[in-house]
Amino acid sequence: MNYLVMVSFALLLMTGVESVRDGYIALPHNCAYGCLLNEFCNDLCTKNGAKIGYCNIQGKYGNACWCIELPDNVPIRVPGRCHPS
């Protein structure tokens, strides 16, 4: 039984686990991508590995792109100020 658990654990480590989340895709300095059209956001999100994206009109950060199932390696907007350069 212990052998089966160890083999399963080793396989899990070797294959890795890709996790995803939903959120506003972020520019550098914690700024959300502004939008007017769903097509812009869908293209942006899917090019960054998300399942789909759309323009969230009048959302928490104004008109901004919301991505569904965005990979963890792509930054999302987090609470706090946007600091454009």
Swiss-Prot record:
Subcellular location: Secreted
Function field: Alpha toxins bind voltage-independently at site-3 of sodium channels (Nav) and inhibit the inactivation of the activated channels, thereby blocking neuronal transmission.
GO cellular component terms attached to this protein's record: extracellular region
Record family assignment: Belongs to the long (4 C-C) scorpion toxin superfamily. Sodium channel inhibitor family. Alpha subfamily.
Tissue: Expressed by the venom gland.
Entry protein name: Toxin BmKaTx10
Keyword Secreted carried by entry: yes
Free-text note regarding domains: Has the structural arrangement of an alpha-helix connected to antiparallel beta-sheets by disulfide bonds (CS-alpha/beta).
Cystine bridges: 31-82, 35-55, 41-65, 45-67
The entry's keywords: Disulfide bond, Ion channel impairing toxin, Neurotoxin, Secreted, Signal, Toxin, Voltage-gated sodium channel impairing toxin
Higher taxonomy: Eukaryota, Metazoa, Ecdysozoa, Arthropoda, Chelicerata
Domain of life: Eukaryota
One Pfam family of this chain: Toxin_3
Organism for this UniProt entry: Olivierus martensii (Manchurian scorpion)
Gene Ontology molecular function: any one: toxin activity
Every LCN-type CS-alpha/beta domain range: 21-83
Gene Ontology process terms (BP): defense response
Residues making up the signal peptide according to the UniProt record: 1-19
